[in-house]
């Protein structure tokens, strides 16, 4: 693809576009299915007040729910993918709007489901399973719903809580508008006096620059701007944490952490184990910080020095064809069945490969039931090859889950999702390290791997600890002020990075830049997922077929059991600190290897 000009959608060759016709051959077929969805509220309403009536009635309702799930999957995937391939196309924005209206009507019509199911007496439900054996398939789903009984309020109270929904979203919406739409940063200036625009998107590339003057200038531009609005940011974050704690309290949970993790069936101990294990392995990060300072040859290491590569770019230009070929070779340990699905995805246009005008940025995988779809904006870089391996990990997870689970258990939770993608990245990295003889390229790869550990395992755990602490402060009746948040965030940076780096005042404001603090205990899953993936990749390379078989079992499992049990089946026990300790020990070994490689 030409890099001089971004092509229009119509100019992209067919083989580099995803095959959305596999979902609907035409837009008219989509519209026909939308009419079917619009008719669903009437069918749902026929069950109101009747779910506890008989086994047959409850079973028929589960079948209708499955039918609606499949319909929404097809309608949603087609409309969203069409919109994402060219966001300027108003037609598909309209499709999404129509679909959302129909979806809201369906949800509203089915609002009786939870209260009716939790009110069925246990003896009666057991009798239903005996009367209708087919209903047993839904036992786990029904049990999961019924477990929430202690946290479901009276009808009047539920109505009041529902009315607060939009209000509860306000802190995140206000922060998002402030940070993404209103905030402007002064230009950064490089060593030659040339100016560079600073945005949320350009910030990381700027602090990755070899020009230290530019790095410092971008750093001061970003955090100096947030400093001017520190009280606003503290107020929005405080409102968010108060809202989270209000809902947890209203639903009779012991803490906001328990409330957030309950939905994904992850014990609170898993979250706290992660923080404890990383604390026990801080010395590896201190070693890495010391090595980074040494390799950059600076008198003092600052936070704006953390992102710049310590190894000059090894000029690893990798075309999309080469990336596919390398990923296939790297994932060979996964076995022929896995590779066959990977090849099917490569050959049958599951992937939308290159950038075009109006196309959504970044990369993702969407698990449509017909087959997964992957959006890329491929450039010929090492990073883009890792993105391909990562997103195909998600895609094959979706494919195997959909093929092996009934509709009701085909979705998987984020806690497991990040394992499937990151395991592929770990296998790709091990393959490249094993097959790269060029010393410069090898050092570049190790640096890339070390940065993945730093930004995923250490950094996301620090975020998770900060989030836990500010929730605990609010629960204890303490106020969240800009000064207090700065102090806490500064202390955590000191703890995680040690004395080998200067604690710049600006970094204490980083909490104000992170949108994930509005996502309610989300970030820890990046760190746990990374640890589990490293453990699984090591196991696959060490034990071969038996380990692969166990891991494929995880990918086929969907949400047929809780995520901790699912991973335990593949030999990774996330209820303990062992996988995290082992991953961090590997980070320690890589730091040593990097030091040796750069000494030669």
Predicted regions and their residues:
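C-terminal, non-catalytic "cap/extension" segments appended to globular domains
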Residues: 10-12, 25, 117-120, 140-147, ...
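A well-structured
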Residues: 1-313, 324, 597-600
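Short pre-active-site segment immediately N-terminal to the catalytic Zn-binding motif
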Residues: 316-318, 370-389
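Conserved helix-loop functional segments at active or binding sites
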Residues: 329-340, 366, 394, 398-406, ...
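Catalytic zinc-binding patch centered on the HExxH motif and its immediate surroundings
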Residues: 316-318, 351-370
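Long, K/E/R/D-enriched contiguous segments that form extended
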Residues: 295-333, 339, 397, 444, ...
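Active-site recognition of the HExxH zinc-binding catalytic motif
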Residues: 252, 379-399, 421, 426, ...
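Post-HExxH zinc-binding segment in Zn-dependent metallohydrolases
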Residues: 412-441, 449-451, 455, 529
